[in-house]
Amino acid sequence: AATNLLGKFNVYNMTAAISAAYLLGISLEDIQEGVANLEEISGRFERAVENLPFEVIVDYAHTPDGLEKVLEASKNITKGRTMLVFGACGDRDRAKRPIMGEIAKRLADRVILTDEENYTEDAEQIRNEIKSGMGEKLPAHIKEIADRREAIKKALQIAQKGDTVLITGLGHEVFRVIDGEKVPWNDTEIAREITKELFEK
């Protein structure tokens, strides 16, 4: 059965769901129709922009395990480079930051380290803690752009045919907490806005 969902983890989930449906006596035709009509879940390996020569995927991955899985899933669907835009949340588990930095360095072909939402922490300090997992000197494939919109824009500008731009950390969220203040924000909508600015002239 064909589906619109991306990523190997979705294949595993669908396999389990198909098996359960079959065991419950649901016909193969109904199962096939159900799978074909599945829609992406907002912020979960979501294709944010259509009709570009490269993929733009938004995912909520905000833990080391989540980041590793989504990068591996991206590599499985990408002919070109996997380009990661990511950061880490403030006022949360600080120990995971260098681990996520190491994972990003190891698995992504290009990395743009950016701010996510700092809450009440110093945003630069959060980035520094992520960078501590990337080695003493940032490798050439890693750039740091604090402004999240500019980081996403840069990734979209340098993406080439067959690449995947992967924007992680906020997923389906519709706001960020910056210096204690809620600010409207959605990675998918921002990626779409920037795409229009760059490619629909």
Question: Predicted regions span which residues?
Answer:
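A short glycine-threonine-serine/GTX helix/turn-capping micro-motif
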Residues: 1-8
